[in-house]
Swiss-Prot record:
Pfam family, one: COX6C
Compartment(s) of residence: Mitochondrion inner membrane
Membrane topology category: Single-pass membrane protein
Gene Ontology BP terms: oxidative phosphorylation
Protein name: Cytochrome c oxidase subunit 6C-2
Organism of this sequence: Rattus norvegicus (Rat)
Length: 76
């Protein structure tokens, strides 16, 4: 019995294409995961914080406080 009959022949063609296909799919999945984590972990809370701040923000009150503190030179 020869050793060639015991082991199957290794695949020699398409190794790079197969490896790239697997890794591209993995990279795409990881990229989607990171994008979703950023959106829901950073962007949405930041957007909500800005909305909450500007919902109750009174710019004239803030201006008057700064004017009385002497921040502006031209507004007395």
């Amino acid at each position: 019995m020869s050793s060639g009959a015991l082991l199957p022949k290794p695949q020699m063609r398409g190794l790079l294409a197969k490896r790239l296909r697997v890794h591209i799919v993995g990279a795409f999945v990881v990229a989607l995961g990171v994008a979703a984590a950023y959106k829901f972990g950073v962007a949405e809370p930041r957007k909500k914080a800005y909305a909450d701040f500007y919902r109750n923000y009174d710019s004239m009150k803030d201006f008057e406080e700064m004017r009385q503190a002497g921040v502006f030179q031209s507004a007395k």
